[in-house]
């Protein structure tokens, strides 16, 4: 089978930095134990399991504050998705050692919200309900940040926004086409709105790569966790922009061979939080796949989870 490897794909710098910081915490004997990660360090269950295997506990809850309240001692790692000021304050009050792995691009949005709300703005924030990145952003100024994901929610915004200064910004991993459409609708309702599109560069170039490169293939496989918003958006872009059917899989074991019937050329990409070795297993399998040769249908290649984490240099005493 012909395989088209969409480029760029896979890890972004924010994910790599977050994983390195968490791995360095594990390797640092001076940090108080136990080590907890407040939510998934990045949205990939294989990465989470790799850290669990090293004795690092991933703690989750309905929100970050609820999860934090279950931690009484040790070290807490804040994930790449960013954290609200109140959660940070509470971690300090509990006497926890903090390792902050927040993505710099996310922190830029936090700074923007902090600056604009201090100047008297309300903020319309385009993001996904229930995702930790909007939770952290809203927490910067909870009385002045309004989360929307869908167009109908624009009509439900407070009436005071017609008379106030308004900023619209967004979660960094949204579909750039969805964000643009929502911004256009917001501008029609609030002509005085100030726009700051914060789709991060890594998200943008990966979406554009799919839009431009997947169109001449019969199928796109996106390798990414179901909780990874940027991975799910890549499949959406393939269907809606490139016109190519797409499926998202967490790893090779989730690939349904029925999808490959009648397909001669398949494209492969991966989300920003997907480990490269996991994507490589999918590409290698598809490259040797022959529908008429059962010996090429084995989808259970061994992968050492420890190998998906970035290496850290030994710490000197």
Swiss-Prot record:
Segments passing through the bilayer: none
EC number, as in UniProt: 1.17.7.4
GO MF annotation terms: 4 iron, 4 sulfur cluster binding; 4-hydroxy-3-methylbut-2-enyl diphosphate reductase activity; metal ion binding
Details of cofactor binding: Binds 1 [4Fe-4S] cluster per subunit.
Residues that coordinate or bind dimethylallyl diphosphate: 43, 81, 131, 228, 230, 273
Any one GO BP annotation for this protein: dimethylallyl diphosphate biosynthetic process
Record organism: Exiguobacterium sp. (strain ATCC BAA-1283 / AT1b)
Binding site for [4Fe-4S] cluster: 12, 103, 200
Top-level EC class: oxidoreductase
Function field: Catalyzes the conversion of 1-hydroxy-2-methyl-2-(E)-butenyl 4-diphosphate (HMBPP) into a mixture of isopentenyl diphosphate (IPP) and dimethylallyl diphosphate (DMAPP). Acts in the terminal step of the DOXP/MEP pathway for isoprenoid precursor biosynthesis.
Positions of (2E)-4-hydroxy-3-methylbut-2-enyl diphosphate binding: 43, 81, 131, 172, 228, 230, 273
Gene3D superfamilies: 3.40.50.11270, 4-hydroxy-3-methylbut-2-enyl diphosphate reductase, catalytic domain
Similarity comment text for this entry: Belongs to the IspH family.
Name recorded for this polypeptide: 4-hydroxy-3-methylbut-2-enyl diphosphate reductase
Superkingdom, natural source: Bacteria
Cofactor dependence: [4Fe-4S] cluster
PANTHER family registered for this protein in UniProt: 4-HYDROXY-3-METHYLBUT-2-ENYL DIPHOSPHATE REDUCTASE
Catalytic activity: isopentenyl diphosphate + 2 oxidized [2Fe-2S]-[ferredoxin] + H2O = (2E)-4-hydroxy-3-methylbut-2-enyl diphosphate + 2 reduced [2Fe-2S]-[ferredoxin] + 2 H(+); dimethylallyl diphosphate + 2 oxidized [2Fe-2S]-[ferredoxin] + H2O = (2E)-4-hydroxy-3-methylbut-2-enyl diphosphate + 2 reduced [2Fe-2S]-[ferredoxin] + 2 H(+)
Disulfide bonds: none
